[in-house]
Amino acid sequence: MKDYTYSVTEINEYIKDLIEGDPYLTNVSVYGEISGVRPRKGHIFFSLVEENARLECVIFGGDNMGIRLQEGRMALVEGSVSVYIPHGTYRFICSNVRYLDQAGMYQIKFETTLKKLLEEGLLSRPKKTVPRFPRKIGIITSRDSAALQDVIRTARERKAPIEIYVFHTSVQGDSAREELIKALRKANEYDLDLVMIVRGGGSKEDLWGFNEEDVIREILKLRHPVVTGIGHEIDRVIADFVADVSMHTPTGAAEYVIPDASEIHEDLDSFLEKLIASLSNRFDMEERRLETLYFRLRMIGRRKLELNEFKIERVKELAAKLRKKLMDCFEQDQEKLESLGRMLESLNPLRPLERGFVLVKKEGEIVKESSDLKRGDVVSLVFKDGTKKAQVIG
């Protein structure tokens, strides 16, 4: 370090050159709350404040231009940082002031957070694959929300053999941020096939919890694939950008994630057809190979056969091994067919009736809870061998 003594002016001038020569402090935009407006000698001095910080600002000639700043208003100011050498202070020289409403504030925060995540490469990370036939699905939403009912209704309509785990959280309001983080962390502890994050539509303020940086970073920590269905068609939150799959609505997300039972049957039928065709082709091919070997052996003269008896034995050994290999393959494929059969049988809704259970229907609909019935209701009792009518007496 040089052995040199600076004057106050030299230090301030050096700092001025550093700050005013920094492109990140020139022609930039800053937002905050207007405070301490002080017109003086044709200029307007004021502060931009937020919870734990303050930035001194000035509009040169602003008073003469008829500019009137309002205390307490949120504003976006444009300009550059400058150093005032006589006092050794810095301030923001404003070239333009624009008031912000609540929507404007949310939009600025949205863009700022999105840009930060983009610069960190978090929006371009590889996407996880969403399983086609999930069995365990976690849902992060309010237990009282219409979004949850949309997902449950879709699951019932599709008759899919799935387990649903609900991780309750507020989806709007002051507590949404902390509760969403807790729900995400809880879901990460479970052995799930995927996680759905859903809620219905609303204003930017209602949906803001899904734009909070802390919430987004917690979503990125999930071990499971993430599917979002937040808001309506026009709504877009930052959680959608980091999800592995993003749908426009809760119902859309549910339809994407939950397979239809008919699709499962179709896939099984297709697999069985391909398996049978593959086995048939394999047997045909091996049969032709054996016929070819047999024909070649017949063409060989007796004398040559006697001289090459060991070759014949070798062919027999190979044929035996081939036969054994075919039988092993057949047994393996038979096990697969039996497994598929058991899976199809487990999907049969009438299976429990063979064990003595009774299916209760009211007006053609299955009764799932006792609260769905009242005294005097006429119901149908479905046994394994027929149906009987009954009346609720208590």
Swiss-Prot record:
The keyword Hydrolase applies. It comes from the Bacteria. This is Exodeoxyribonuclease 7 large subunit. It is an enzyme of class 3 (hydrolase). The keyword RNA-binding does not apply. The gene is xseA. It holds the Pfam family tRNA_anti_2. Bidirectionally degrades single-stranded DNA into large acid-insoluble oligonucleotides, which are then degraded further into small acid-soluble oligonucleotides. Signal peptide: none annotated. GO terms for molecular function: exodeoxyribonuclease VII activity; nucleic acid binding.
